[in-house]
């Protein structure tokens, strides 16, 4: 993998080389890729310059990772396409089951998609309770471009 060739072979990796490719390592790499792609998205709108936090948030809320882009980035099979918005910071609710076989984690299922009819009411209820407890006024996504 490129990460082994360009990072670990040069002694620049922060994790143990044997952790490369494991589920928790991959989650970190995916999260980093999403952050970079959000910045790229924001720079397409605001210019190729240092961005403000608000501009990066705009990039996250307008991120559209297609299957083609995921493949181009070398992440095919690691995540499903996702499209984020002000109202949906997840972008997708897909997951797979991993199982430890005593030596390594192995994917043992196809992709599952969360049931929004169950999940979204729970998310909204929990978010509203948190906002009330912390005295936070939630953003009105109808006013966001």
Which stretches of residues belong to each language-model region?
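Segments of small-molecule ligand-sensing domains
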Residues: 12-25, 32, 36-109
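Extracellular/periplasmic periplasmic-binding protein-like sensory domains
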Residues: 1-31, 111-118, 125-126, 138
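Sequence contexts marking disulfide-bonded cysteines in secreted/extracellular proteins
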Residues: 85-87, 140-144
């Amino acid at each position: 993998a490129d990460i082994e060739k360009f990072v670990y072979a040069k002694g620049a990796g922060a994790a143990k080389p044997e952790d490369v490719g494991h589920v928790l390592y991959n989650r970190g790499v995916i999260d980093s890729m999403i952050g970079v792609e959000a910045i790229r998205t924001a720079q397409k709108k605001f210019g190729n310059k240092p961005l403000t936090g608000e501009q990066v948030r705009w990039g996250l809320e307008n991120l559209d990772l297609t299957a083609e882009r995921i493949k181009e980035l070398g992440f095919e099979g690691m995540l499903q396409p996702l499209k984020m918005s002000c109202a949906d910071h997840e972008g997708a609710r897909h997951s797979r089951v991993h199982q430890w076989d005593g030596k390594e984690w192995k994917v043992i299922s196809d992709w599952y998609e969360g049931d929004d009819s169950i999940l979204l009411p729970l998310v909204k209820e929990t978010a509203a309770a948190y906002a009330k407890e912390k005295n936070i006024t939630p953003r009105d996504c109808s006013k966001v471009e």
